[in-house]
Structures are given as C-alpha cells and as structure tokens.
Design a protein with these regions (language model features):
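Exposed, low-structure sequence patches enriched in small/polar residues
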Residues: 1-237
C-alpha cells in the first residue's frame, strides 16, 4: 500500500452517456429521445509541504521525544474533492412533446489540516426532477386598437423542482470529537411559460420559489419568491 500523499498517477475522471435504447423499435414508437448519463469528477491537491530537517535517511524509523516517527516531509493541508455530477440522469422526450428529466447528484469535499489534526468534511445530495411540454401553433384572439387579430405561436411550458441537502462536519482527530459547523437544506421550485407573439417578439412568465433551512441554530430559515413577465424582442432576422 502506497502511503505517499504525493500521487504519481492522477485520479480518473469519466463521463458516460447512453442513447442506444432510442434505436429499439419499442422505444422509437414512444420516445423522440431517451438517454441515460453518468459523470465523475475528482481533484486532489497538496497546498503546502516541505522537507523535514530532522529526518535521518540512515535511520528512517527514528522517533521524536513524544514517540512519533519523524517523517521525511512535513505536510500542512491535503484536499480531496469528488463530484458525481450526475450520479445518474434520465432525459426523455415523448412523441407528444412531453419532456421529463430526473437527476441525482452527489458531492464530497475533504480538507485535512495536519497542523492541528482537523478534518473538515462537506457532503451534499441533490435530487432534480423537471417536466416540459410544448403546445404547437396555439391560437389566441386579441382585440388591439379595435382590430381583431389572431396570434399563432408555440407555447412552451417548463417546471423544475430540486431538493438539496449539504452538511459540513469538523472532526478533531486527536480527541475523537465531531461537530456540525455548517449546512443547509434547499428546496427550489421553478416554472416558466413562453409564447411567441410574433417572429421577433416573445413573452415569458416566470415563477421562482426558493426555501432554505440551515443546520446550525444561529441561522433562521429563508424563503424567496420571484415572479413576473418578460418581453423579449429579437432584432435579428
């Protein structure tokens, strides 16, 4: 087992996406798109290290006055970050223009301080589900300036909901003491509806609801709500 913190081989990262089910006849009759995805990202860093002048190459197992082995190098901080972004993701679109997205994400960050024997561990889990639907050639009758006009365009509806919980734990390796220092639970609900009034003009309705509850008792829960309409004009052709 290699105990050297300086790794000679980098940690692997990968990203996988499978769309082969879309080629099956049973899926072609129901779905326009059917994909499954998975990805992993990691980083490993040493922020500071130096040669130990007390180390004797002729006696590598020499101990100090406290009975600890004198190391060849002194390390201050070691960091490891891992992300499953996503752990699994399902993205499908039906023949009737209905879209469904389901996603699970996980991440973890470890920071080891050898100066004071503290390990800071942050971890998070996130669940995402989304739906979308397009109503093609929706006709709306209007009466502007006394003239009756019929608008025709696509109405795009989209709704997303995500739930995330992250927590930070401070672990004292000398006294075997663990303490929650930070963390929160996040709930987000978003809804949008856009309609093409003309070739260049689009109107958008949005609703954004966010709720957060903190893990520590010194912080209060927070809720924010944003909603409104947006007009977007495209000056291009």
């Amino acid at each position: 087992i290699n105990l050297d913190p300086i790794q000679s081989v980098p940690l692997p990262n990968w990203s996988l996406k499978y769309t082969g089910l879309s080629s099956l006849k049973a899926f072609k009759n129901v779905f326009n798109r059917f994909s499954i995805a998975h990805a992993y990202r990691a980083s490993y860093t040493l922020t500071n290290f130096q040669t130990n002048l007390d180390f004797d190459p002729q006696n590598p197992f020499q101990r100090d006055e406290a009975g600890n082995v004198i190391p060849e190098r002194l390390y201050s901080n070691i960091n490891l970050v891992e992300q499953f972004n996503p752990l699994v993701r399902l993205d499908v679109e039906f023949k009737n223009s209905l879209k469904i997205l389901a996603e699970l994400k996980r991440d973890r960050a470890l920071s080891l301080s050898l100066d004071n024997s503290l390990l800071t561990e942050s971890s998070g889990n996130e669940y995402v589900i989304g739906m979308g639907y397009r109503i093609k050639d929706l006709r709306i009758r209007t009466n502007l300036n006394g003239r009756r006009t019929t608008l025709s365009g696509d109405l795009n509806l989209k709704a997303d909901m995500s739930y995330r919980r992250n927590i930070t734990v401070l672990r004292n390796l000398e006294y075997n003491n663990n303490q929650v220092t930070a963390g929160q639970t996040l709930l987000s609900i978003k809804f949008t509806a856009d309609y093409n009034l003309s070739r260049n003009l689009t109107t958008l309705f949005f609703y954004d609801h966010n709720f957060s509850k903190f893990e520590v008792s010194t912080a209060f829960p927070q809720t924010s709500i944003r909603s409104g309409f947006t007009l977007r004009y495209n000056f291009g052709n």
